[in-house]
């Protein structure tokens, strides 16, 4: 059981955030605020969500994309991070797992995920 002050603080952190509903297998486009010196800029990161973990303020998710020379790039983001400007769901994936770590071993067409039909 958490302390009531901690619960109030966490509720305040979550309050203003508008997070879309997404799960493992969905293709996401993230706008990340990057601070370099005294300047800030927005950098996009697009990839497949391979896992979600935790709940509340401490909830995180892992996004994987294939970078240059077919090198996989994975980044872990807290859902309620201040550096996340926006999260957009581009495609809904049809998967039967909550964790898609097997995609780390797949290359090319084998790493594709079917789109969820509406």
Curated annotation (Swiss-Prot):
Family (UniProt): Belongs to the bacterial ribosomal protein bL19 family.
InterPro entries xrefs: Ribosomal_bL19 (IPR001857), Ribosomal_bL19_CS (IPR018257), Ribosomal_bL19_sf (IPR038657), Translation_prot_SH3-like_sf (IPR008991)
Entry's Gene Ontology molecular function annotations: structural constituent of ribosome
Keywords of the record: Ribonucleoprotein, Ribosomal protein
GO cellular component terms listed in the entry, alphabetical order: cytosolic large ribosomal subunit
Known function: This protein is located at the 30S-50S ribosomal subunit interface and may play a role in the structure and function of the aminoacyl-tRNA binding site.
Record's protein name: Large ribosomal subunit protein bL19
GO biological process: translation
Keyword Cell cycle: no
Signal peptide location: none
Organism: Campylobacter jejuni subsp. doylei (strain ATCC BAA-1458 / RM4099 / 269.97)
């Amino acid at each position: 059981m958490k302390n009531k002050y901690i619960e109030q603080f966490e509720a305040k952190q979550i309050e203003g955030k508008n997070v879309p509903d997404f799960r493992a297998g969905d293709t996401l486009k993230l706008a990340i605020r990057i601070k370099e010196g005294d300047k800030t800029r927005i950098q996009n990161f697009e990839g497949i969500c391979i896992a979600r973990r935790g709940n509340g303020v401490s909830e995180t998710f892992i996004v994987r994309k294939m970078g240059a020379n077919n090198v996989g790039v994975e980044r872990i983001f807290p859902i309620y991070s201040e550096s996340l400007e926006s999260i957009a769901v581009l495609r809904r994936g049809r998967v039967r797992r909550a964790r898609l770590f097997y995609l780390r071993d797949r290359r090319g067409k084998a790493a594709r995920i079917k789109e969820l039909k509406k």
